[in-house]
Amino acid sequence: MAIDNKDKKVLNVPPLRFPEFSGEWEEHTLSEYLEFKNGLNPDAKRIGQGLPFISVMDILAEGVITYNSIRGKVEATDKEIDCFGVKNGDLLFQRSSETLEDVGRANVYMDSRTAVYGGFVIRGRKIGNYVPLFFKYLLATPLARKKTCRMGAGAQHFNIGQEGLSKISLSFP
């Protein structure tokens, strides 16, 4: 059963939490948990066959990203697979959007099979200790979205880069 913190007013603790957790949440930047890298930009003749190719549409889709849910395909070299491949638990961020509200949206790759990600995507590779699915939902909270949108820049088209994502600070249990 969840514990209600509304009356206790403990600092930096969610109003409703599970009894297995105690103490305040700690602030950490995304760079403490993730190493960021921009995606692959292949020429058009390589698109349509080959390996699953994660795009913005896959990030925005409901649920997590799996090998079978990826919509696109691309022919990739072994070197490109090494450089732009995704691993189970990698977080993928939307790098560019026509609306500020969508810039930096995130999803998680939850599969062990080889796939690569595209140039309008930034991969967050795990370097810290976290649960990937928790991280996906944390990044979708109103506070996380507000902090992410603040890092977006642009007039008609909004972008966020690796540096902007690295600086986002969130609370972790």
What are these language model-derived features?
Residues 60-72, 91-117, 133-137, 146-150:
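Short, ligand-facing micro-motifs at secondary-structure edges
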Residues 13-40, 167, 171:
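Non-catalytic DNA-recognition/assembly elements of restriction-modification systems
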Residues 4, 40-41, 79-80, 110, ...:
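Short, solvent-exposed loop/turn positions at domain surfaces
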Residues 4-10:
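BZIP DNA-binding basic region
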Residues 31-43, 58-90:
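Sequence-specific dsDNA recognition surfaces
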Residues 10-14, 41, 114-121, 130, ...:
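A short glycine-rich beta-alpha junction/loop motif
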